[in-house]
């Protein structure tokens, strides 16, 4: 079982692989506007994509994010574009099959 589980970190990407299932978490800091997350894993099928924002302590503005790309785009281009309305760090979590 030990040989079936691996993990690694590349730049802002943390990747956990269990057999052919991969969870890739990408931390994207930045300002308001469209951001791009670079995906390191060559997914064959994406099961889930989620965004989690982290705001600065004391921030008064609501945080909102919207994903621009569908799963086919993410697989083909190994990137994900999303919009943020503020200056928060966003974690992108992609779960899929390789």
Could you say what each language-model-derived stretch is?
Residues 1-7, 11:
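A signal for long, low-complexity, Ser/Thr/Asn-enriched, surface-exposed stalk/shaft
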Residues 15-98:
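Extracellular attachment/recognition segments
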């Amino acid at each position: 079982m030990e040989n079936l589980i691996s993990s690694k970190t590349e730049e802002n990407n943390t990747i956990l692989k269990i057999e052919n299932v991969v969870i890739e978490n990408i931390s994207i800091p930045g300002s308001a506007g469209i951001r791009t997350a670079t995906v390191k894993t060559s997914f064959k099928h994406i099961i889930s994509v989620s965004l989690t924002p982290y705001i600065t302590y004391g921030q008064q503005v609501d945080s909102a994010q919207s994903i621009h790309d569908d799963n086919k785009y993410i697989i083909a281009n190994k990137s994900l574009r999303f919009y943020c309305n503020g200056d928060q760090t966003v974690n992108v979590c992609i779960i899929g099959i390789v």
